[in-house]
A protein has these predicted regions:
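Conserved binding/recognition cores within well-folded domains
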Residues: 1-76
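Eukaryotic intrinsically disordered, low-complexity regulatory linkers and tails enriched in Ser/Thr/Pro
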Residues: 1-6, 79, 85-103
């Protein structure tokens, strides 16, 4: 990941979620928060499916880090990530398929 003219390596398994803010992304990991100038779509090219799931137009989550679902939000550590209405069913199906949640 490129950040302030530096290249930084981030372990994919440590990423909790990626949040888009216009042309910037925030990559929240277990140990740090990095900000990079890149559209979310470009970052998603490097994140393997089905581990990483887009759950909202502004959020991609690491499905292995989901602890709970509370209404229309996913709980990952102390963070609550919104689930878009139009992506709700696909999100649940993906989590079920990977045996990360049960009905």
């Amino acid at each position: 990941m490129k950040n302030n003219k530096q290249l930084k390596k981030i372990n994919l398994n440590e990423i909790l979620y990626v949040q888009s803010l216009e042309n910037y992304v925030i990559i929240q990991s277990e140990t740090s928060k990095e900000i990079a100038y890149s559209p979310l779509k470009k970052i998603m090219e490097y994140l393997p499916e089905p581990q990483f799931i887009q759950v909202h137009r502004s959020f991609v989550i690491n499905s292995l880090k989901v602890e709970a679902i509370e209404g229309n939000q996913l709980v990952i550590q102390n963070y609550k990530i919104p689930i878009a209405r139009n992506l709700r069913e696909a999100t649940f199906e993906s989590l079920l398929k990977n045996k990360l949640i049960s009905r």
